[in-house]
Curated annotation (Swiss-Prot):
It comes from Candida albicans (strain SC5314 / ATCC MYA-2876). Residues 61-70, 106-116 have a biased composition (Low complexity). Its EC number is 2.4.1.-. The chain crosses the membrane at residues 13-35. GO terms for molecular function: alpha-1,2-mannosyltransferase activity. This is Glycolipid 2-alpha-mannosyltransferase 2. Residues 1-12 are cytoplasmic.
Length: 461
């Protein structure tokens, strides 16, 4: 249809429609230059990488790299840097090289995970001087030793799982189990399944778990009755006395231990609070130590009324066994006149079996045993071990493991330094640490050994 028809139309609405269409056509033609604007092509064809600013390089390793950052960096949307520099309250994952911050814990001074691992402990670096893998040093002749009944199995496997997770999965040391009865197959199967090293099971000879011929059984019974009336812990127990005598004088004689020089005693229902990334056995051997402990405590005086007098008689008759530079001042406050009851808690001890096998200790135990004090009183293996170590060893042969984090019964040893607890994944509460409490002998040990107390100790005494 020709345009003239619209203009000549007699119908008014067609005339108006023609005017509108003409106006639109003129406007489009006069503004056609918009479609040729080069900016529109830039916007529609520019790749995303040019329109969105790239993040700055992560953690530049040199000043030159830092200077190459864009000048308008303050206008760029920041992205998180790599995990080692992430915000301290951000937890990304459980990788040991990507540690979240803990409130109150200072930043580590190490510049790399490798340096952090080297600074973790002097002991770890000493054990790895000839190896690139510090957790797999050359093993020593050592084993765990546990005295347990079949009825204690499920309390014991918790201890085993704990020790394996915190320490032995890295080192695979053997485990010797002893019992005054035959072990059940279930006991053997479960413990073998949990232990990463070899497991060995032994029955205690009857003569090591019974009354010697020289004991007056009636007198021993009267002692148990009297102690029960006095409400002395384990005062009426026969089995407890047999256990203390066995741990004092016979466990180290068992044939299953003949192949070993070192042992670590583990009991049911204990807890290891911290990761142990070095070989504690090898540390003892390399540093010429003999006896190691975690908790020191006072003994109940009513259980050992004549133990010290008997010990003094032995020393008087055998002065040659008293070591130079011994640790007498830890167990006596008056140069040996009386016993102050301090001892190392023997439910955790790492020690050299050859010390117990030696002449001095053998004669000392036999001397004590002949008096009947295990049955006429209630002598414990802990004070006997401790007195022997304090008298027959130079004090520098005794070692306090301040880094284990150990709990048995109601008493806990927990490292006091927050950074250490963080780095070693300790799950203990330092408020429960027993080391510097009143009933502990921790303060005396530090003072008499000439050691500097942790800077946090006053807060937890």
């Amino acid at each position: 249809m020709k345009p003239s028809i619209f203009y000549s139309s007699r119908q008014p609405y067609l005339k108006y429609l023609a005017i509108i269409l003409t106006t639109i056509t003129i406007y489009v033609l006069t503004h056609s230059s918009y479609s040729a604007d080069p900016n529109i092509n830039d916007v529609t064809t520019k790749p995303i990488s040019e329109t969105v600013p790239q993040p700055p390089p992560q953690s530049p390793s040199s000043p030159e790299q830092q200077q190459q950052q864009p000048a308008n960096q303050d206008q760029i949307v920041k992205v998180p840097e790599e995990l080692k520099n992430k915000p301290q309250d951000l937890v990304v994952d459980n990788n040991k090289d990507q540690k979240p911050a803990v409130s109150g814990v200072p930043k580590s001074s190490s510049s790399s995970p490798q340096q952090q691992e080297k600074q973790d402990t002097k002991k770890e670096s000493e054990n790895s001087s000839s190896s690139k893998d510090p957790v797999k040093p050359e093993k020593v002749k050592a084993t765990f030793v546990t005295l347990a009944r079949n009825s204690e199995l499920y309390d014991l496997i918790k201890s085993i799982r704990n020790v394996e997770d915190r320490f032995n999965r890295k080192f695979n040391y053997d485990w010797v189990f002893l019992n005054d009865d035959d072990f059940t197959q279930e006991f053997k199967d479960l413990t073998t399944a949990l232990v990463s090293g070899k497991t060995k099971y032994g029955k205690i000879p009857k003569e090591h778990w019974s009354y010697p011929d020289w004991i007056d059984l009636k007198r021993a019974e009267e002692t148990r009755k009297n102690m029960k009336l006095q409400k002395i812990i384990y005062g009426d127990s026969e089995s407890y006395r047999h256990m203390c005598r066995f741990e004092s004088g016979f466990f180290w004689r068992h044939p299953l231990l003949d192949d070993y020089d070192w042992y670590w005693r583990v009991e049911p229902s204990i807890d290891i609070h911290c990761d142990l990334n070095y070989d504690l056995f090898k540390y003892m051997e390399d540093n010429n130590k003999v006896y190691g402990f975690t908790i020191s405590i006072h003994e109940f005086r009513a259980t050992i009324p004549t133990l010290w007098d008997t010990t003094k008689k032995f020393i008087k008759e055998n002065p040659q066994y008293l070591a130079e530079n011994n640790f007498m001042d830890f167990i006596s406050d008056d140069k040996g006149e009386t016993y102050n009851l301090c001892h190392f808690w023997s439910n955790f001890e790492i020690a050299n079996l050859n010390f117990w096998r030696g002449e001095a200790y053998r004669k000392y135990f036999d001397y004590l045993d002949q008096t009947g004090g295990f049955f006429y009183e209630r002598w414990g293996d802990a004070p006997i071990h401790s007195i022997a170590a304090a008298l027959f060893l130079p004090k520098d042969k005794i070692h306090y493991f301040d880094d284990v984090g150990y709990k048995h019964s109601v008493y806990t040893q927990c490292p006091l330094n927050p950074q250490f607890r963080y780095e070693h994944k300790c799950h203990c509460n330092p408020d429960n640490d027993f080391t510097f409490r009143g009933y502990s002998c921790g303060k005396k040990y530090f003072e008499k050994m000439g050691l500097q107390k942790p800077k946090e100790w006053e807060k937890y005494q």
